[in-house]
């Protein structure tokens, strides 16, 4: 009995101080996508790009997964299935106030599990390549590596005029 009370007490304390894991669910929320991206200007400083991601969040071609904490969307991901065997992580972003809590990893793990269960074998993601020195994107590349992605190739003029690194993760 003591261990059950202790565990229950720990959960209540975690909830009280806001460290409970977020709920991960499939939901479209273009407004939350815009809000989160606008709060991340080091990655999403182009208003046109934010408009495009907001439209993608409303587009049924993309699967939208969100992380919700206390009723607020604090993380978003958009995935597009190109073929039965492969999909692209089109967007992942976490509210800066919620960074460092494992929310990005939880979103990717959820997306990967859903895709794997549906027969998908490979997940790709595009980010700014290492030949363009930029500290925020160096953090992005490190995050993708830490969540199981491996660099495949770098191209110029793919998603923007500079270098794009394509990373892949086996599911």
Residue ranges and their predicted role:
Residues 100-113, 117, 138-139, 146:
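Conserved acetyl-CoA-binding loop-helix of GNAT-fold acetyltransferases
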Residues 24-91, 95, 108-109, 114, ...:
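Acetyl-CoA-dependent GNAT
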Residues 115-136:
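Conserved GNAT acetyl-CoA-binding A-motif
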Residues 62, 162-167:
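Short hydrophobic/aromatic beta-strand or adjacent loop that forms the aromatic wall/cage
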Residues 92-99, 129-131:
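A short, internal acetyl-CoA/4′-phosphopantetheine-binding micro-motif in the GNAT/acyltransferase core
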Residues 1-28, 171:
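Conserved N-terminal entry element of GNAT/NAT acetyltransferase domains
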Residues 141-154:
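Conserved acetyl-CoA-binding loop of GNAT-fold acetyltransferases
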Residues 53, 131-132, 160-161:
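Short secondary-structure capping/turn micro-motifs that flank functional sites
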